[in-house]
Amino acid sequence: MMEKLIITAAICGAEVTKEHNPAVPYTVEEIAREAESAYKAGASIIHLHVREDDGTPTQDKERFRKCIEAIREKCPDVIIQPSTGGAVGMTDLERLQPTELHPEMATLDCGTCNFGGDEIFVNTENTIKNFGKILIERGVKPEIEVFDKGMIDYAIRYQKQGFIQKPMHFDFVLGVQMSASARDLVFMSESIPEGSTWTVAGVGRHQFQMAALAIVMGGHVRVGFEDNVYIDKGILAKSNGELVERVVRLAKELGREIATPDEARQILSLKK
């Protein structure tokens, strides 16, 4: 029998704006409301970027604190997973600020990626090792974000060097640097160490295709406005909750139960 399905909601990201979808949250209140919509629909993890009220991405620790407190009021047991990716161009010190709050999880990007145009999301070897070391020191479990197979190899190397601890949890972000096909997902899932867990974030039109594949393959799923603002072709999603609801329906139709936050903690070996 497969593990229950962990659904992560990436509710706002750093790149998508209200011009893409008016429901994208910026303010503390909007972020908390979107987190609640995803949580009530079945998400057990909130992947969190935060914004200033005008939509500018920020890694400010106090802004994260306010957003986390507001989310906790509405979703007391949800797992909150701050991003250490921040936004393109931020310094390492800026990106690490939310980990000072000692969340249960945070992301760890294991390589550099072209984001389109002149944007390069830079993660040098020294950056990755430093982030890994600090996450261990602060008791934060990394979700290892990988955009292609080479980043899995980097993560395995850094684990052997002591900068990442087992069991490892990966997030395959497909449809950016690497294509998003069934073959790609099988290849990625078979390339990680035994005993690891994984989730997939299909970007744009790939979101629900990748979700369906992950459900039947025994992986987990990330959806949300960060990766996709449409519920169907040409139809904007009204909320992150609507995106989560679609994954829940898929899972039920395919015979996969949904994990609660505490069940997700057990699957991911988290310490609450």
UniProtKB/Swiss-Prot annotation:
InterPro entries (alphabetical): Aldolase_TIM, BKACE
pH profile of the protein: Optimum pH is 6.5-7.0. The half-maximal rate is observed at pH 5.2 and 8.1.
Means of activity regulation: 3-fold increase in activity by addition of 10 mM 2-mercaptoethanol. Addition of CoCl(2) and to a lesser extent MnCl(2) increases the activity but not MgCl(2). Inhibited by phosphate buffer but not by 5,5'-dithio-2-nitrobenzoic acid.
Superkingdom, natural source: Bacteria
Any one GO biological process: L-lysine catabolic process to acetate
Pfam families attached to this UniProt entry: BKACE (PF05853)
Residues the record lists as binding Zn(2+): 47, 49, 226
Catalytic activity as recorded in UniProt: (5S)-5-amino-3-oxohexanoate + acetyl-CoA = (3S)-3-aminobutanoyl-CoA + acetoacetate
EC primary class: transferase
Biochemical pathway: Amino-acid degradation; L-lysine degradation via acetate pathway
EC number: 2.3.1.247
Residues bound to (5S)-5-amino-3-oxohexanoate: 15, 83, 86, 107
Record-stated family: Belongs to the BKACE family. Kce subfamily.
Function: Involved in the anaerobic fermentation of lysine. Catalyzes the reversible reaction between 3-keto-5-aminohexanoate (KAH) and acetyl-CoA to form 3-aminobutyryl-CoA and acetoacetate. The reaction involves the deprotonation of KAH, the nucleophilic addition onto acetyl-CoA and the intramolecular transfer of the CoA moiety. It can also use beta-alanyl-CoA as substrate.
Subunit structure, interactors included: Homotetramer.
Protein name: 3-keto-5-aminohexanoate cleavage enzyme
Organism per entry: Fusobacterium nucleatum subsp. nucleatum (strain ATCC 25586 / DSM 15643 / BCRC 10681 / CIP 101130 / JCM 8532 / KCTC 2640 / LMG 13131 / VPI 4355)
Lineage of the species this protein comes from: Bacteria, Fusobacteriati, Fusobacteriota, Fusobacteriia, Fusobacteriales
